[in-house]
Each structure stands twice: as C-alpha cells, then as structure tokens.
Amino acid sequence: MVNFVSAGLFRCLPVSCPEDLLVEELVDGLLSLEEELKDKEEEEAVLDGLLSLEEESRGRLRRGPPGEKAPPRGETHRDRQRRAEEKRKRKKEREKEEEKQTAEYLKRKEEEKARRRRRAEKKAADVARRKQEEQERRERKWRQGAEKAKQHSARKEKMQELGIDGYTRQLEGEVESLEAERRKLLQEKEDLMGEVNYWQGRLEAMWLQ
C-alpha cells in the first residue's frame, strides 16, 4: 500500500506505508519458524537412528552374532578369546560410527545457528539502514520544501515591491547575467581543451622520437 504526501507546491510523492514493513516482518518470522521446524525434524530423525542402532546392538549382544550356535566341542581358550576380541572390535567400531554421526549432527547444528545469526544481524542492519535512509529522505524533502517556500515568498515580496514590469526587467537582467557566465565557462573549457591537446601532441611527438 502506498500513501502520498505533499511536497512543495501541488506535488504529491509516494512514501512507504507502515503496513508494508509489518508484512515484511511477518514473512521473515514465518520463514524462521519453518527453518526451526525442519531443524527439529532432522534432530528427531538422527535421534531415532541412534536409538535404533543402540537397540540393534543390545539385541546382538544378547543373541550373539547371526547364525552363531553353541560353541563346538573341542573349542580352545584361544578361540574364545579371538571371538571375544572380534565382538569388542565390532562394538568399538559401532561406537565410533555413532560418535562420528553425533559430531556431524552437532556440527551441522552449529553451522545452521551461525547462518541464522548472520541472517538476523544482516536483517537488523538492513532495517536500521532503511530507517536511516527514510529519515534522511524526509529531512531532505522538508529542507527542499522549506527552501522552495522561502524562494516563493521572496519572489512574491519582490514582485509586490517592484511591480510586474519591474520584476520582469529584474528577471531578464538575471537571465542575461547567467547567460554571460555560461559563455565565460564555455570559453574557459575550450581554452583548457586546447591546452590539453597541445601537451598531448608534445608527448606524442616525444614518444615518436
């Protein structure tokens, strides 16, 4: 939604409506809630996976390795030690894998927190910058309007003082003065361009030698 405010004589300029900023803040809030919901779903999925691994590990410890039967007759002490060592090795590998998954999950969480923090800081900086720019724009419009009103009042007083004919002659004199100043500036520009061309020619001649 856009409103219009008066600036100077018979002019209306658009300004941002507070409802636009409110809608933008609501949209940003909904996006943040959606990201938090996705993070929670991911966290629940990882926790479910860890619990499943733990339950599977406990079941294997109770049942023994798949297909394992009663120790065969004549099994030596060294065989039992080797089997126990293999079990400990598998358990250690599972624990290492679980620790790796947990570390990766925590790392992703920290990275996401850092991204959200950077987005929040950037958003706050953008909001502050827009507010500052809006304030400066309003102050500039106010100064321009005040200056135009002052000039209009001065012209009106001068016209009343000199009359229509006198004020017209004064304006014509000002126009002639400005035209003379413009011609002077053009002549100075031509002189400078001529000097530049002169020195450029000198430099080119030196390079050719």
UniProtKB/Swiss-Prot annotation:
Alphabetical GO biological process terms: viral process
Q: Where in the cell is it found?
A: Host nucleus
Enumerate the residue ranges of region (Disordered).
48-162
Record motif Nuclear localization signal 2, residues: 116-120
Function of this protein? Contributes to the regulation of viral RNA transcription by interacting with host proteins involved in transcriptional activation such as ATF4, or CREB1, and by inhibiting their activity. Additionally, HBZ suppresses host NF-kappa-B-driven transcription mediated by host RELA as well as transcription of some classical NF-kappa-B target genes, including IL8, IL2RA, IRF4, VCAM1, and VEGFA.
- Cite the InterPro entries for this sequence: HTLV1ZIPPER (IPR026220)
Motif Nuclear localization signal 3 in this chain: 137-141
What molecular functions are annotated in GO for this chain? Answer: DNA binding
What keywords does the record list, in alphabetical order?
Answer: DNA-binding, Host nucleus, Host-virus interaction
Recorded domain comment: Contains three nuclear localization signals NLS-1 and NLS-2, corresponding to two regions rich in basic amino acids, and NLS-3 corresponding to its DNA-binding domain.
Recorded protein name is HTLV-1 basic zipper factor
* Assembly mode: Interacts with host ATF4; this interaction inhibits viral RNA transcriptional activation by preventing ATF4 binding to Tax-responsive elements. Interacts with host CREB1; this interaction inhibits host CREB1 transcriptional activity. Interacts with host JUN, JUNB and JUND. Interacts with host EP300.
Name the residue ranges with Basic and acidic residues bias: 70-87, 94-114, 122-160
Source organism of the structure = Human T-cell leukemia virus 1 (strain Japan ATK-1 subtype A) (HTLV-1)
GO CC annotation: host cell nucleus
Q: Which gene is transcribed and translated to give this protein?
A: HBZ
- What else is on record for this protein? Expressed from antisense transcripts. While mRNA expression levels of HBZ-SI were similar to those of HBZ, HBZ-SI seems slightly more expressed at the protein level ex vivo.
Q: What stretch of residues is annotated with the motif Nuclear localization signal 1?
A: 87-92
Q: Which family does it belong to?
A: Belongs to the HTLV-1 HBZ protein family.
